[in-house]
Amino acid sequence: MIDLNKISKVVVVFIVLLTFLVLMMQSQEVKVAGLLIQFENETTEPEVTAILENYDIPVNYTIDYNSNIGRGVYYVKVDEDKINELRKNENLISEIELKKGNYNIIILSEEFVPDENFLTILEKNNLQLKKVVVCYIHFGDGPADWVVGKNCILERDAIRIKNELETNEKVLIVGLDDIEG
């Protein structure tokens, strides 16, 4: 005869072990405490708030608008037919080049100092050197005890949000603020 009480105990032990295993695996996954987002010049704080509200961010967050984390980062928005002319400048130290719609965006390194030659090329091609608006999105609203779903999210969720945000024409780049350990 089958002892249902014994089977119930085995099932309970199995569920407890499985739960423990899932929690251990989750604690070993990379967690993200926030996002560093570079927006186009003149993106306002209300626009940043509206943009973020359109994405499924699974925790509360605060916005550090125009954060001093990325001070002095500039970019140039260039039509495809003018990009080669701009690349001829030897002093152009681009950190990142990306394609947004019909434009190429050249994000310049923080060390870049525009010289007279560079400014002449910009003027000749009717281009403008613009400063990015850097915002830090801090997940959660409590102490930094790194609880997934409270004040951090899993890396896979952060990557999904990053990829979705980067399709927005006002967003230039999104970086993840990973938590060590």
Swiss-Prot record:
It comes from the Archaea. InterPro entries: UPF0228 (IPR008887). Belongs to the UPF0228 family. This is UPF0228 protein MA_3117.
